[in-house]
UniProtKB/Swiss-Prot annotation:
The lineage of its organism: Bacteria, Pseudomonadati, Pseudomonadota, Alphaproteobacteria, Acetobacterales. The gene is pqqE. Binds 1 [4Fe-4S] cluster. The cluster is coordinated with 3 cysteines and an exchangeable S-adenosyl-L-methionine. Its EC number is 1.21.98.4. Its cofactor is [4Fe-4S] cluster. Catalyzes the cross-linking of a glutamate residue and a tyrosine residue in the PqqA protein as part of the biosynthesis of pyrroloquinoline quinone (PQQ). PROSITE patterns: MOAA_NIFB_PQQE (PS01305), RADICAL_SAM (PS51918). Interacts with PqqD. The interaction is necessary for activity of PqqE. It catalyses: [PQQ precursor protein] + S-adenosyl-L-methionine = E-Y cross-linked-[PQQ precursor protein] + 5'-deoxyadenosine + L-methionine + H(+). HAMAP family: PqqE (MF_00660). This is PqqA peptide cyclase. Residues 4-224 form the Radical SAM core domain. Keywords: 4Fe-4S, Iron, Iron-sulfur, Metal-binding, Oxidoreductase, PQQ biosynthesis, S-adenosyl-L-methionine. One of its GO terms (biological process) is pyrroloquinoline quinone biosynthetic process.
């Protein structure tokens, strides 16, 4: 294999603790408890090793990263090592004192999530009463601090009708960028798929709404749009390709090529407590497993898109078929594409209740998926 370029970004999942209980959370079903989280000095070492490896962007996430009192200290170290710093937050713990500490540390950017523009529905989705007013205050604090305001709305069948109002609210808050992200069905999102998966008609209306707003707000607000795979003909690239541009560190120190990768139960992921980042990136077997194109089965191997979508998502392939090697079922050419079609067909007219993201609330698997025959 040719020389491995360093990862552009590192996602530091500082904790799985979070005041919210969103049913589409990308955290694993088995949430890691506070007692096994990396200590401050371990995260500081990771900041140093990331800089030496060539990482340019340091993203702090969770759970809710502001649960960690050492967050400003970690940001300051990343800034000292000349990495761009970004926090991905619910905003419910961001007050004046924390904002002052973050600015003193040198934070570059904060991405603020919203569950809906409708207060009652937003707080039903997030499972936290009073959250919306705290989020609005957080947006104001970010703007007053002089930072660019990026908002994230996760959309699904139970809030999609409010998309026009979400975009209006984003503009009113002074957002320079808004991400409209359809739920990605991994982890808790997969558990809640029937409660979240929109109809094709809902998706088409949402897509048209985004396209109209992009044209109308050109030069005012950038709108990113992430579509669901279930109505796609081609898969999305896995983080720009498995272990090509991105590395994720879990709260306990597992190093992952993407935030959902530990769902791949057949792979053993290294710990930063035992490996250096450089050794993980260049030599860990789990990182080599799906890097590049040599691993690809047909039809990926001979497809002219093989270095565009990189075979799609390994986590989705495994979650839906029990086979992590198979072409992503999102691809119309995948032997497992019917699994996607069947999921859409099975979608009920009435959304079931959410299974909320919290420790001890994950459903117990009642069957083991068998690989889909080619």
């Amino acid at each position: 294999m040719s020389t491995i370029e360093p990862p552009m970004g590192l996602l530091a999942e500082l904790t799985h603790r979070c005041p919210l209980q969103c049913p589409y959370c990308s955290n694993p079903l088995e949430l890691e408890r506070a007692g096994i989280e990396l200590k401050t000095e371990e995260w500081l070492r990771i900041m140093d090793e990331a800089a030496e490896l060539g990482v340019l962007q340091m993203h702090f996430s969770g759970g809710e990263p502001m649960v960690r009192k050492d967050l400003p200290e970690l940001i300051a170290r990343a800034v000292e090592r000349q990495m761009y710093t970004n926090i991905i937050t619910s905003g419910v713990l961001l007050d004046e004192a924390m904002m002052e500490r973050l600015m003193k540390a040198g934070i570059d950017h904060i991405q603020l999530s919203f569950q809906d523009v409708d207060v009652e529905n937003a707080e039903r989705i997030g499972g936290l009463a009073g959250a919306q007013s705290k989020k609005l205050k957080a947006a104001r604090l970010i703007k007053e601090a002089g930072l660019p305001l990026t908002l994230n709305y996760v959309i699904h069948r139970q809030n999609m009708e409010n998309l026009p109002r979400m975009l209006e609210a984003a503009q009113a808050m002074g957002a320079t960028r808004t991400e409209i992200a359809n739920v990605q069905y991994y982890g808790w999102g997969l558990v809640n798929r029937d409660a979240l998966l929109p109809s094709r008609e809902q998706l088409e209306i949402a897509t048209a709404t985004v396209e109209e707003a992009r044209e109308r707000l050109k030069g005012v607000m950038v709108i990113d749009y992430v579509t669901p795979d279930y109505y796609a003909k081609r898969p999305k690239a896995c983080m720009g390709g498995w272990a090509r541009r991105f590395i994720n560190i879990s709260p306990s120190g597992k190093a992952l090529p993407c935030h959902a990768a530990e769902t791949l139960t057949g792979l053993e992921f290294p710990s930063v407590r035992e490996w250096s980042l450089a050794d993980i990136w260049s030599g860990a077997p789990a990182f080599q497993k799906y890097r590049g194109t040599d691993w690809m089965p047909e039809p990926c191997r001979s497809c002219d898109r093989r270095e565009i979508d990189w075979g799609g998502c390994r986590c989705q392939a495994f979650a839906l078929t029990g086979d992590m090697d198979i072409t992503d079922p999102a691809c119309a050419l995948s032997p497992a594409h019917h699994v996607m079609e069947e999921a859409v067909s099975a979608r009920g007219d009435v959304a079931p209740d959410y299974v909320y993201r919290r420790i001890g609330n994950a459903p117990v698997p009642n069957e083991v998926l068998s690989p889909v025959a080619e």
